[in-house]
């Protein structure tokens, strides 16, 4: 699955450029004709659907044209996540979730419950900050984090911040072991 995120600016910003131009640059840089998932990055307010309509419209056209298969948002605020759950434009939500309630937008239980509502609506759910933005990386904490993400959360998949092949191998081994139950 090829996913990327697009930084956005408020309505009226001189930094805004046409979505199609940004997507053309992304596709050239990645050497691809399309992206499976494209997210509006770092939504921090519940009104993102109003303030980011320019981008939503551009991505809706790209989706219609087959340049993007699914669209969504990365959430960095509770209200932004609620908006993502309720907004039919949003196919995928990237949300901060871990069993330590570290660097999240609510309690572990509340975020997981909200994501359960999104899951029932057919949205794709990707977890981030699984290790609490690198604050919970002891062996026991990594195990607990992966076990939670794989067996207890409403996530479909997760992104992990890793710094080495050994860390990647460790994470894969933990996911595979926990997925087998």
What does each model-identified segment do?
Residues 1, 6, 24-34, 61-63, ...:
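Intrinsic structural disorder
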Residues 1-11, 38-41:
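A short, structured active-site edge motif that brings together acidic residues
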Residues 1-3, 36, 72, 126:
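A structural signal for isolated positions on well-ordered beta-strands in alpha/beta enzyme cores
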Residues 12-21:
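Glycine-rich anion/phosphate-binding loops
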Residues 22-30, 80-82, 114:
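Short, charged beta->alpha transition segments
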Residues 27-47:
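Active-site groove signature of glycoside hydrolases
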Residues 42-181:
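Beta/alpha (TIM)-barrel catalytic core signal, keyed to glycine-rich beta->alpha loops juxtaposed to Asp/Glu
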């Amino acid at each position: 699955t090829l996913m990327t995120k697009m930084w956005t600016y408020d309505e009226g910003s001189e930094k805004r450029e046409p979505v199609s131009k940004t997507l053309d640059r992304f596709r050239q840089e990645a050497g691809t004709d399309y992206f499976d998932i494209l997210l509006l990055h770092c939504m921090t307010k519940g009104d993102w659907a109003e303030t980011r309509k320019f981008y939503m419209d551009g991505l809706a056209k790209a989706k219609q044209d087959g340049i993007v298969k699914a669209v969504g948002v990365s959430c960095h605020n509770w209200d932004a996540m609620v908006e993502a759950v309720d907004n039919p434009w949003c196919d995928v939500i990237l949300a901060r979730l871990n069993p330590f309630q570290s660097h999240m937008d609510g309690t572990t239980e509340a975020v997981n419950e909200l994501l359960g509502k999104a899951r029932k609506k057919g949205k794709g759910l990707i977890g981030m900050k699984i290790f609490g933005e690198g604050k919970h990386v002891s062996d026991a904490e990594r195990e607990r984090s992966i076990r939670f993400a794989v067996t207890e959360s409403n996530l479909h998949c997760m992104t992990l911040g890793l710094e080495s092949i050994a860390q990647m191998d460790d994470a894969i081994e933990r996911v595979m072991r926990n997925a087998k139950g």
